[in-house]
Amino acid sequence: MSRAIRNIAIIAHVDHGKTTLVDKLLQQSGTFAAHQHIAERVMDSNDLEKERGITILAKNCAVQYEGTHINIVDTPGHADFGGEVERVLSMVDSVLLLVDAVEGPMPQTRFVTKKALALGLKPIVVINKIDRPGARPDFVINATFDLFDKLGATDEQLDFPVVYASALNGYAMLDPKEKSENMRPLFDAILKHVPARAGDPDGPLQLQISSLDYSSFVGKIGIGRITRGRIKPGQDVLVLDGDKPPKKARVNQVLGFVGLERVQMDVAEAGDIVLINGIEEVGVGVTIADINQPEALPMLTVDEPTLTMNFQVNTSPFAGQEGKFVTSRQIRERLDRELRSNVAMRVEDTDDTDVFLVSGRGELHLTILLETMRREGYELAVGKPRVVIKEINGEKCEPIEMLTVDVEEVHQGAVMQALGERRGELQDMQSDGRGRVRLDYRIPARGLIGFQSDFMTMTRGTGLKSSVFDEYAPIRSEATSRRNGVLISAEQGEAVAYALWKLQDRGRMFVSPGDRLYMGMVIGIHSRDNDLVVNPIKGKQLTNVRSSGTDEAVTLVPPIQLTLESAIEFIDDDELVEITPKCIRIRKRFLLEHERKRASKAAA
């Protein structure tokens, strides 16, 4: 007897409450014992996810409700991890679209909804954070309907059920005026509106792998949904991978999800979401098929990367002093390991054996990888991010992003001017009547490189911005480059307070007294547009002659604290970010001044 199954994904914009909602569904379905302590955002298991409050990897879990097994997939909201979202949607029969009751649909909501509607999925719309002051559910429902209509939804998809919820407080209702204590209305809506499992359990096996995991114990793990047939441990199967010849393989283990645990299954059948291991050839999009009647499913497509960066061996004078893994072989092995599960990423070799070209879906996608490597003890240098240029019909084209910014009205002018300089085109402008404005732009992706820090300064930390890839379009005129030059250290040694104090009039510093510096290292932002070589390790000249002047009190302005994102956004083409487990430094590509002059002449 087949068990009743529902497969759903939760999709939403960043910070609209996906992971918190999953927490409450797990708790209220009785998946955890009553006495068990549950961490907040239990699905965000990665350290970086917990710190930043974002979901990076799509996760699977399952709950039991009234005899039905509900598989839930929690997806990332950032477009940089959209490669995850697209594949996950191929495993499910419906989606819960979470929309903030105040903000309404946002760019990533648009990105993921477009993918879901194109696959023919019928969403259940959940208006979350209904308890927030300023909640406007009717406006949000109308905006969601308009969004569906713009994205070409069918009449059936436009007739979507709506559930009102507060994931944080753990309740849901079908009418915002009702009172509710729990999530039952949402569970009931899932059972009512999500189609039951489809597929013939007695037909020949078809299982498409839509995401990968890796275990040092069993090797590659494929995660996917069984479209047809049954699978059990020890079964012989064929691996069908596009045009490649079919390969025979044997399944080692079949695992299913119960709560957050992975549980071994004796047999799984059509409609189940399972993990299988023991097959070395497993990859995203491949079909695991019956050995006697193999039939391949169409390959899954993942959007191509839009941003590329050079990862290279650290060649600074401090190379190898702070990291555990420093050689090109170790960096390449780590990147290869990342490729096993990070499907939207590409790694290519270059003419220089110490430099690798790494491409991803955005700045966040690549900086998360760099931060992970840094914490694992890797030491490396990276260059300025560049957009991936494609040639379409003989014309060079660049990626264009849909950008939404939400700012206070007093900052609107400065933000619009900055986006205009970066070749942005204003598409829409809406005021919420409470002193904030939402601006929608189409802007070249390279115009957004380095915009985050400027934007936060302009809006005094109150602005919200998010962008999502829209299309490739012919290259427009050049975007503006960085306005300020940099201050470059002329010597190697430790920074001296007196020298930094004397240099304060020249610009803002990145370094503090006592920091180790080397020749060619960038120590601050120059107040003018040219680079300036300075000596930050020069002490005060002391003599044995009694001076009539008293000692001057040295008061230093606190330095700018470099984070990985801010450093990568800041650098120019002739600079590198040196990343070690202990430090993030900015340096010139050529450390010696005469080499820099020679390189700039050659470039001219």
Residue positions per predicted region:
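Conserved structured catalytic cores and adjacent interaction surfaces
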Residues: 3-20, 79, 105-114, 120-124, ...
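Interdomain boundary/hinge elements
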Residues: 38-40, 151-163, 197-208, 243-257, ...
